[in-house]
């Protein structure tokens, strides 16, 4: 017969084996969940707290989007995410007015490695919406409108811009919804030194090229885009004297504000993740 010491050793060994098996099973389950969640094309953002045992209730617009736009059917899978968790759900039933989702699994949304703030002058509605949409897809963390000397679009529908940002994140498989702040003055932006560096886009082709700069994703970066008609001479002087501020060129061509924002964001994201 086994002694008490041998029994204790065997029990301890069994506990270690169970712990190792449970750990690997948990990791495998996470990998499988991540793979399936990435493959699910139907994605909906719900701006409220959801518990894993809750019933997810969608509003009329979201149901219409799932059924009529994405053509979601019974037994299809839908990714539902809020600001904290990502849920893999299965459609139990869907009609024009109702949608019943069963929660299959969930995971915590990890914070993004980068932090990029886009400072921009509000422009006309259509190009502004394009800028918000594309920069949300690419990865802007915070949109900060700035009232500049040549700003000619001061009335902005921020609720619509937030909706556009949400839809862009749903489409692009991004789980972090960017913030869209209320406008600040140019002077307030100049006096802000909370970020590691500020890159203002200049029409001077002799300025620094972003691709030649040393940028890392663990540093908070600000991109400053001028209004239609560019920064004024006085604003250029303020930008040049601003702490941690560097002028950058986006090439020899004169880009529209929304094009400059999208281009600068793309170059910086590629630089910090792929360089």
Region spans (language model):
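Short amphipathic, helix-prone segments within low-complexity/disordered or flexible regions
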Residues: 2-18
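RNA substrate-binding interface of SAM-dependent RNA methyltransferases
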Residues: 110-197
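Active-site/ligand-binding-proximal alpha/beta "capping" segment
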Residues: 198-237, 246-248
